[in-house]
Amino acid sequence: QTNFSTLEAFFVGSAPLYDALRAFAAQRPLRMHMPGHKGKPLPAPELAAIAAIDFTELPPTGDLFSGGGAIGAAEALWAEVFHMDSCLFLTGGSTQGVHAALALACKPGETVLLDRGSHRSAYNALALLDLKPVYLERPWLASEGITGPISPSAVAQALEEYPDAKTLCITSPTYYGMLSDLPALAELMHRRGGVLVVDGAHAAHLPSLGNDHLSAA
């Protein structure tokens, strides 16, 4: 009998995808699919419950590419938490999200204002989409030993120098937790008919801390 108490501590209220995985695991199905551990307990006791509900895409568990079902319910719940109109879970990690966002925001050959501290996925997107970068350097904060935020004034200056740039792509928060003023940056870009693209791979916790106004969502 699998002990799910360690997992349930993470869930408060509705958890449609977790509930669907638990319900399917309770049927004790014959696992003729990935992953190779077949739901058997892993060496670390704290991972036993995770292995029990570790399924691939199946009719009872849902498919990230088609939506609906438990995955669709989970996406709707996530959108509600982040105050978004809708949500789509990525099928290939945050790198895929950066690629998709820039592909939607830009046309080949366009100029992009790019945070110099961006993840390599943004640089890969430049090559894949034939985009021209204008790099924004972050200020060095000597007392903290890290770089600071991308400031609205720096972006405004870059827009004056490169008026054809219609997309700003930054990371917020950074790996070190540095947040940029997203509302101000978004207003600045929207006022010029532009788009703000944010790599928020490290921002999922912000709404739970009451800082959802600093989240890209």
Please report, for each region that a protein language model flagged, where it lies by residue:
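Conserved N-terminal alpha-helix of the aminotransferase class I/II PLP-enzyme fold
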Residues: 47-96, 117
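Short acidic/polar alpha-helix capping motifs at helix-coil junctions
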Residues: 38-44, 86-89, 150, 154
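N-terminal "arm"/small-domain region of PLP-dependent enzymes with the aminotransferase-like
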Residues: 1-69
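Conserved PLP-enzyme active-site core in the AAT-like
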Residues: 4-7, 11-22, 26, 66, ...
